[in-house]
Amino acid sequence: MRLNFWLAITALVVAAVHASTLTPSVLPLIVRNPYLSIWFNHARGYPWANWPMFWTGSTVGFAVMAAVPDSNTVYPLLGRSQDFLGRSSSYNVSFPKYHGASFDASTTNLTYTIKGTDLKITLSFLSPITPTSTFRQSLPAGYLTAFVEGSHDVSIYIDVNGEWVSGNRKNQIVWNFGKSTSRSSGTPIKTWSIRRQDEQLLTEFNDHAEWGTIHVSAPAGVEHQSGEAHHVRRQFAQDGSLKNRVDETFRGIFEEEPIFAFSKRFKLSKKSNSSSAAKDSVRFTFALTQDPVAQFAAARGLTQMRPLWASYFHSAEELIQYHFDDYETATFLAHNYSEQLAKDAYASGSRDYQDIVALSARQVLGATQFSGIPDSPLIFLKEISSDGNFQTVDVIFPAFPFFLYTNPRWLEYLLEPLLEHQKSGQYPNEYSMHDLGAHFPNATGHADGRDEYMPLEECGNMLIMALALANAFKDNPRPTFSQTPPEEAIALAAGPVRLPNSVDAYGMDRSFEEMGTTGEKAAVEWLARSYKLWKQWTRYLVEEALVPANQLCTDDFAGPLPNQTNLALKGIVGIKAMSELAALIGEKEEAKYYGFVAEEYIEKWQDYGLSSDKSHAKLSYTWRGSWTTLYNIYADALLCFHLPEDGSSLDNGRFWNTKQAPIGGASKPHFIPDKIYKAQSDWYYAVLQRYGLPMDSRHLYTKSDWEFFAAAVTSKKVRTEILQHVAKWVNESTTDRPMTDLYDTEGTGHFPGIYFMARPVVGGHFAFLALERACGGKAVEGLKFLDEAEPTDIDVQESLMADMARLEEPPRKMGEL
């Protein structure tokens, strides 16, 4: 039974070879958190042309080779090992035929054939996304499986160096070689463990962690060797094998560069026959263990936070063994997620959309660290590559559609550190904080209140995410993805913490019902715990949202601007969200009040924020002849304020029975009128550029997260056009780092002088997928009117000039607004 299951899993993994059509410039290999983040750069070229890289672009020593004894030839497969081989009478160096890369949400496959043979080699890198197993998602580890097929003998080799454990290449490293003891249910394995000689806890150098140990494991039957890079790689090239020797002279990362290698020989010639080629594989695992993972100014004070996995295992060795043996289950769950994601993306967008969200998924989770305890997990998030802040609210916000789609509870675990810290009184301002700390992994807070000043932005973000999460708990209490592990799943052994209520014996998340509650009860309880904060932040919005002061929005690189139309909309939708939050926990009078304020503000906002011909939203109330991508309108649809007109008025809250008094005595079918959705959809169609939708009229650069927020609430035709333009950028972009969210929509699609890379905000690419699940599946139905007519033909220049012509009119006094 286990063999059949293994064959089925193998077929699933290799099938991913055919799963992608786009050709991004960089692909994820092993990406689990901000410090275990290995990428294939220049991914449109040969994998042996460059070394793999850390997300910053710095190289990482990681080589894979194949040796064919019949011809005494060694073939570099990944990394520039050929630079170390030189010329020799003992072996030949050649390159395989490379058939390209393919990927799904969890897997990247590189496929090769060897000239003059029937050998086929697939390197399959798996960083499993397991939405129904938070336990597995928390494991800081990934897999490389080498699949071989043919009738010729072949050996596979891998090595790593000290660049995995320090950004300062002058540092000294130490290492250990160990073997696990055979267990009744465990696979005997060998492990290289490498770390800095003098670790610096919770410290970074060029964004690399300066503490922690990388563990590289393989089955006990493989050969191993450590030593100077030239010597070890030439040893494999010469013999197709290693000497099972350990270099015990600790030294610097590039001091007679020590590397740590495994090799595996496959006797395929003895297994194949005339009717079929032999197939085999070898698995390697890579785990970066760090304890602590962060320090956090929690309610109890500054605390060194342990990794979540430490609640399940007594030691790193236990973690490594379980992870190695759990490959089949992790693969099964990851494939289930990838397959469902592909189906949903194709149904709602296109084949290109499949690839874009698949490419984005690991990047989102690559910014996270899982901490806390099993019944109260926390997810910490690094604002990768921009400021490096800890738990940045306006980075979580663009990423949150990914979490709503994948596992809404993970969004709860992201928001909880922000709520706990602010409820404890450690943040002095009345508005929501921007982040928990100036630099990850240190969430020491901002007791002086001098974090980056984005008060309106962050208050709106927190309230919108709070209601979206509550709705998700209520409407979709059970995840779409598989909650049943395969029969071969390995039960968790007794760990330091007794088996939690939220996790079953096989590490699968329990549903709300299995935990003795319901999604709606869980939503109410979660909201009630922080109700004081929700009210506090809404008071700020009531005072400041309608006419925003000169302040930053999340797009802070563009600078501050007063009267921002899009920012005001976020604040007003945030007030509307508060009316629903209040209603959900039974505060009916407050719900009515905030609902009334929101309705009054949205009426005025339409007057202030739209162009004179009502064809588009202005960048700023007072900036005539400007336009903006109105991405914050997405929240209106996501929060169920724009449901189909089926006889039930939206003036009735979704969670309470008292009717809100309508503005002006007339019932409104929608919070934001259809005409604004239609106008923006048509406008986007008119201003599209070669590589997508510019952010606003100031520049030709764009933010891909906001492109997808905007596209989610346009007509299908416009959405398809935006997707196709972004897909064209993915295929043609000259950017050479993990997918940027900020790029030029013209020229070469390069960075616009600001280098964003590997940021979790690409979770915004899931905006339409999250919208399809919102409101019990009814959110997208409320937007079907957009498909009833073709986009209106707009003369953009004429519209902008007409708006500017009104500059001669007396300006409105903002004090009278």
For each feature predicted by the language model, list its residue ranges.
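C-terminal capping/lid segments that line or modulate ligand- or cofactor-binding pockets
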Residues: 22-53, 455, 462, 622-645, ...
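Fungal secretory targeting signals
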Residues: 1-19
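Long, well-ordered core segments of solenoidal/helical folds
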Residues: 165, 364-372, 408-429, 470-474, ...
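Well-ordered alpha-helical scaffold segments within catalytic/enzyme domains
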Residues: 37-41, 64-67, 112-114, 148-149, ...
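Acidic/polar, glycine-enriched structural segments that form the non-catalytic walls/loops
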Residues: 20, 136, 152-154, 158-393, ...
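Extended ligand-binding clefts on enzyme/binding-domain cores
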Residues: 188-244, 385-395, 401-408, 420, ...
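An extended acidic
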Residues: 27-118, 207, 216-231, 236
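Aromatic-rich carbohydrate-recognition surfaces in CAZymes
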Residues: 312-320, 388-548, 564-582
